[in-house]
């Protein structure tokens, strides 16, 4: 059963889908009155609905059954530097949503490159990823903020992934398999070129746990997937399988440079 998005979904009653979603239901999927579809509101409410009417290419549906889902625990908060290349940034947001990230905080670091902020487009990306992955919740997206502000406001267990080997002399990085996936966690990924050494030191001094994603140097969006996949199944074997599946399915859509 296909999943569609309707932000104002209620647990019962009838409603009319947006013009865009109606077009997908009627003209793309060619549903007819009497067909059943699934509707999500991005806040945990999921409803099985019956298509009751099609008028002027707008679809009216009636809720047959609904259930309110709580956000799955543990929650993962992603703090990541925005990317200069818009398509790579949007790809990152899409895959983070598919992997079930709870919150995304764009943090502005010393090496963050110029970026553009397109919130309405990001909302559409989140909705599409939610429907595709059959998830029930949209991630929270914060406005971009300086790293110092994020550091002052964050109180979760934080892992900062970096590749500065010189910092290991003071506080060695732990490997992915040593991450604690049993509680709410924040994962920090820096910009292209990594965090500045002084930023790493401030984060570690403030309680962040330095993390290694392996011997290879990864682009920001790849590092995000590698880190988030650790939380998907709670074990490296399941996380690795999930990461492999995601990378294979995304290969044709990932922007290449």
Language-model regions, residue ranges each:
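RNA substrate-binding interface of SAM-dependent RNA methyltransferases
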Residues: 68-160
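Glycine- and other small-residue-rich loops at beta-strand/loop junctions that grip anionic moieties
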Residues: 81, 115, 192, 216, ...
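Residue-level signal for inorganic ion chemistry
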Residues: 34, 96, 126, 203, ...
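Glycine/charged-rich beta-loop-alpha catalytic/anionic-binding loops adjacent to active sites
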Residues: 15-17, 73-77, 183-186, 205-213
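Active-site/ligand-binding-proximal alpha/beta "capping" segment
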Residues: 160-200, 208-213
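N-terminal positively charged helical leader segments and presequences
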Residues: 1-69, 120, 244, 251-257
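A generic structural signal for short beta-strands and their flanking turns/coil linkers
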Residues: 13, 33-35, 45-47, 57-59, ...
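Structured adenosyl-cofactor binding patch, chiefly the S-adenosyl-L-methionine
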Residues: 197-240, 246-247, 257
